[in-house]
Amino acid sequence: MTRALDRETISTRQGKLAELARKAPDMALRTLAHHIDLVWMHEAYRRTRKDGAVGVDGVTAEMYEERLDENLADLLERFKSGRYRAPPVRRVHIPKEGTGKTRPIGIPTLEDKVLQRAVLMVLEPIYEQDFLACSFGFRPGRGPHQALDALWHGLMSMGGGWVIDLDISSFFDTLDRKHLETFLDKRVRDGVIRRTLGKWMNAGVMEDGAVLHPEHGTPQGGVISPVISNLYLHEVLDLWFEHEVKPRLRGRAMLVRFADDALLAFANEADARRVLEVLPKRFGRFGLTLHPVKTRLVDFRPPGPTRDGDGRSQRERSFDLLGFTHYWGRSRKGRWVVQRKTARSRLSRALRRVRQWCRVHRHDKVADQQRALSQKLRGHYAYYGITGNGKAISAFAYEVVCIWRKWLSRRSHAGRLTWEVFQRLLQRYPLPPAQVVHSVYAT
C-alpha cells in the first residue's frame, strides 16, 4: 500500500513538472535534482529491468537487493554530493541477422541503470512538452503502431507523393556532445543533473578488457539514451523541418520519426528534391552523416495511366519502415490505397529464429513446444497483424507449422511425420491462427 501511495506521489510531482514546462516553454529549469529522493529512487529501481546482462562490475539484481535500502541511499548521496562516478559501459556486439555484420550495444551496470532511470523520470515530463507530434520512438503512450497509423493517414490524405527514406549512419556513435550540451542548455541547467549527464557521456566503453573513451557519440543501450537521441533529432530534424522547411514548400509535407528512423513525404516533387539536396548539409552541421545509398527518394504516387507498369522494380516503388514494406495496392472496392506487408528481411529473420528454436527444443514435450510456439505466433501477430497484412502473417503461420512438423519428424528414426498424423497432433495441440490485431480504420 505504501509503495502504491509513493508511486501516486511521484506521478503527481511529475505532473507538476510537466505543467511548469508547458507553461514556460522557453524557460531553462535550474532546480530539478531535489525531486530525486529515496522514494523516487525506489520507484526508479522498481521500473528498472533486472533480467538483463550485468555491467562491468558483475553485480546482479539479487546481489544488489541484499542491501537494497542502504545501496539506494548511498547511490542517492553520491549523486547529490557529486561523488558519483559513472563506470564504463560494457560493449558487446550483437549480430545483425542475415547481414554478417554486428551492432555495438553498451551494457551499463545495474546501479547506473537505476540512476539513469531516476534522472529520466525527471527529464521525460519536461521534454514531453517540447517534442513534436511527428516523433514516436520511446515516448510515453506512443509506439511503432501509432507511427505507422500517422504515416498511413498522412499518405492517404496527400494522395501519395514523393518520399525521402532517411538513413543516418551510426547515429549513436557520431552524435556531437558539444551540440548536445547546447541543446540541453535550453531546458535543463540543474547542476547536479547536468554534471551526471556529462559523466555518462564521458564514462567510456570497456571492450576486451580495455577502456576506450570515444570523443563523439553516446553508448547505445543505456536507459537515458532514448531521450538523449530524441532531444538531439528534435533539434536537428523535427524543429528545422516544421519551422524552417515546411513554410518554404509549395505543397504539403509530413515527417514521421521513430528514434533515428525517419521518413519525409512531399506532395510536390520539386520540394522533395530540394530538401533531399540540403539534408546532408543540415545533418553535417551537427556531426551526422546520411547513408549515401540507403537514403533515397521514392516516387510513391499511386499507379496511374502513365505510371502503371512503367518497368520500375518493387523497391523503386516502395519503402520499408518499422519492419513493414509500404506500397500501393487495390482495396476490396478497387481503389488504390497504401498497403503494408511484413518486410522480407523481417519475415526471414522471424522464420530463422523459429527454425533455430525448433531444432534446439525438438526433444521437449509436445505440449511445451506448443505453448512456446503459440507465444511466438501471438507475439508476431501482435506486431505484424495490421490491416492489409493478413496474407503475410498467414504465410508466417503456415511456415511455422511446416517447420514444427519437420523437426518433430527428426525426434526419432521412425521416419517422417505424415501430414495425416501431424494434423491429428495439431487438433490436440493447436497453434493460434493468424489474426489482424491493429486496424487503421479504428483510428
Give the ranges of each region predicted by the language model:
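Non-catalytic terminal/accessory segments
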Residues: 1-443
